[in-house]
Amino acid sequence: MQKPDLSVEIAGITLRNPVMTASGTFGYGEEFSEYVNLEAIGAIITKGLSLKPKAGNPTPRIVETTGGMLNAIGLQNVGIDAFVEKKVPFLRTVATPVIVNFFGNTLEEYAELAERLDLIPEVAAVEINISCPNVKHGGIVFGTDPKAAYSVVKAVREATIKPVIVKLSPNVTDIVEMAWACADAEADALSLINTLTGMAIDLDKRRPILANVTGGLSGPAVKPIALRMVWQVARAVKIPVIGIGGIMTGIDALEFMLAGATAVQVGTANFLDPGAAGRIAAEMERYLADNGIADVKEMIGALEV
């Protein structure tokens, strides 16, 4: 039997395999290039980008938990100007599609970032982080209100011709309602889930461990929730879904594809093993070969319910 075909397509972009690196866990790609074969990865998703540099939250801002980790990094990043000057030159040398994750605090910030990124040919697509407060409307998080989510996706859609992926927050009552709002605003794909809000407490000090008090929970602990949400959303929308949440092995990734994901993102696993994304792709290939499956696309949405 020939080697299985691992290629998939997201919004017109062909990926050599379905495994992407999740934003915030792989820097801007260059940081991992000495340790990882970037061409073993389907796509690189950069650390979240904002208009101005962001210092992030005070420490401590990471804590291990049972089956995962909490992070309160605070979206620390270099800002769009330094990204263009210092990060893009390296991206020109990479043969793997680069997707830039970005965020804002107003519709205008989202639109301006989309316009700036639209001018960079090395950027294959954008991923919008909508888990941010809208400072002009009482601080409500864009990603927890369908109307706000629609507005921000629409603003980005009108500002760029690049494919637009929207990263959905799981901290909502109805993830499908959020997915519909983003699809109606002409998103090209949806990625989910972002982290779940959690906290950790130091019993002896009687204080939160994280300086920010709360943080985002990721890792294997969130996988069952992520699988359920991916399954719900994939059945509800006609655009591709990218699965995220506790993917540590090729088996995990293929489970997300059965639930309806066209591709997956690997996040927390990168902290444990910088080569996790490439390893997971290889494990997927091995499973397909061992089970006589010629094309990974046969797995997408093949869950029997």
Swiss-Prot record:
Domain of life: Bacteria
CDD domains, per the entry: DHOD_1B_like
Catalyzed reaction equations: (S)-dihydroorotate + NAD(+) = orotate + NADH + H(+)
Pfam families with a match to the protein in the record: DHO_dh
Cofactor: FMN
Gene3D superfamilies to which the protein is assigned, alphabetical: Aldolase class I
UniProt: substrate binding residues: K47, N71, A72, I73, G74, L75, N129, N194, T195
Pathway membership: Pyrimidine metabolism; UMP biosynthesis via de novo pathway; orotate from (S)-dihydroorotate (NAD(+) route): step 1/1
Bound cofactor: record note: Binds 1 FMN per subunit.
Active site: C132 (nucleophile)
Keywords per UniProt: Cytoplasm, Flavoprotein, FMN, NAD, Oxidoreductase, Pyrimidine biosynthesis
MF terms (GO), sorted A to Z: dihydroorotate dehydrogenase (NAD+) activity; dihydroorotate dehydrogenase activity
Broad class of the protein's primary localization: cytoplasm
Matching InterPro entries: Aldolase_TIM, DHO_dehydrogenase, DHOD_1B, Dihydroorotate_DH_1, Dihydroorotate_DH_1_2, Dihydroorotate_DH_cat, Dihydroorotate_DH_CS, Dihydroorotate_DH_I
GO BP, one annotated term: 'de novo' UMP biosynthetic process
Any GO CC annotation of this UniProt entry: cytoplasm
Residues annotated as binding FMN: S23, K47, G48, N101, N129, K167, I193, G219, G245, G246, G267, T268
Record flagged with keyword NAD: yes
UniProt subcellular location: Cytoplasm
EC number: 1.3.1.14
Function: Catalyzes the conversion of dihydroorotate to orotate with NAD(+) as electron acceptor.
Self-association state and partner proteins as the record states: Heterotetramer of 2 PyrK and 2 PyrD type B subunits.
Family: Belongs to the dihydroorotate dehydrogenase family. Type 1 subfamily.
Matches recorded under HAMAP family: DHO_dh_type1
Name of the protein: Dihydroorotate dehydrogenase B (NAD(+)), catalytic subunit
Lineage of the organism: Bacteria, Pseudomonadati, Thermodesulfobacteriota, Desulfuromonadia, Geobacterales
Name of the coding gene: pyrD
